[in-house]
Regions:
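N-terminal positively charged helical leader segments and presequences
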Residues: 1-58, 229-230
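Amphipathic alpha-helical repeat scaffolds
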Residues: 5, 91-94, 98, 207-212
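RNA substrate-binding interface of SAM-dependent RNA methyltransferases
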Residues: 14, 68, 76-162
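Short, acidic/turn-prone active-site loops that include or flank metal/cofactor-
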Residues: 27-28, 50-52, 115-117, 180-182, ...
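Short, hinge-like loop/turn segments at secondary-structure boundaries
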Residues: 38-40, 65, 127-131, 172-175
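Structured adenosyl-cofactor binding patch, chiefly the S-adenosyl-L-methionine
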Residues: 103-105, 116-119, 124-133, 186-230
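Active-site/ligand-binding-proximal alpha/beta "capping" segment
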Residues: 155-204
Length: 230
């Protein structure tokens, strides 16, 4: 996949990642770009015209540097602490924001259903600001089957659930977050241990999934912050 921009590339390198090739816009210079090139002398670099660079980049603002990398593989590690199950989340901005917050609060694992947006797409990577590199993410998962394998409670975020703020969350727990339009699927709701909701004032039916995810994750962090490593 492609990492667009020196900040994202720098974050990837700091996480221990290896760059395969670099693509540089001949018309753009910066200290940050030059430092990345200088620190990676063995990486092949393609210097191309601006008109070609903008065709490769998906971003509206040109960054000047793109890196080609292999998508990191995640070996399965038995989940513990807080895990997220993401059900059919399509918006790359929401998905990237959720992953960024998950890394910030020390989430152990993120499992994504087959219908979720590609977490390694340029827009999702941009939204996460490279948080992918510090998390264990599993794509293309059958969440219904996965729930049956978990040895701890699985909570689903749902409007008809019990208040999140009245809940003593388990130390080891998975929380399901549903798609922007439909929420958590009926099959996953039926398989969940408990349904929880975020209290809201009258007239507001739901929150953006990214905002809801942040509230849930930070409530877990609040309850267990002395035990969470960030």
């Amino acid at each position: 996949t492609l990492l667009d921009g020196p900040h994202l590339i720098k974050t990837y390198i700091e996480s221990g990642g290896t760059i395969l090739e670099l693509i540089k816009d001949v018309s753009i210079e910066s200290d940050e770009i030059n430092l990345i090139i200088q620190n990676n002398p063995n990486v092949k670099i393609h210097i191309i015209q601006h008109s070609l660079f903008v065709k490769i980049s998906d971003l509206s603002s040109v960054t000047g540097l793109i890196a080609l990398i292999n998508i990191p593989s995640s070996n399965f590690i038995k989940p513990h602490g807080l895990s997220l199950l993401l059900d059919r989340i399509q918006d790359p901005g929401n998905l990237g924001g959720i992953i960024r917050t998950a890394a910030a609060v020390g989430v152990n694992s993120v499992f994504l259903s087959k219908e979720c947006n590609d977490i390694w797409s340029p827009k999702t990577l941009r939204g996460s600001q490279g948080a992918h590199f510090f998390l264990t993410c599993y794509e293309q998962q059958n969440l219904e089957h996965l729930i049956e394998l978990f040895e701890f409670p699985v909570y689903a975020l749902n409007m008809k659930g019990e208040s999140l703020y009245k809940e003593d969350l388990p130390k080891n727990v998975a929380i399901i977050l549903g798609s922007e339009g439909q929420g958590v699927s009926r099959n996953l709701l039926d398989k969940s241990t408990k349904k929880i909701t975020i209290p809201m004032t009258q007239g507001i039916e739901s929150l953006n999934v990214g905002a809801a995810a942040s509230i849930v994750m930070y409530e877990y962090y609040r309850q267990f912050q002395s035990d969470v490593t960030v």
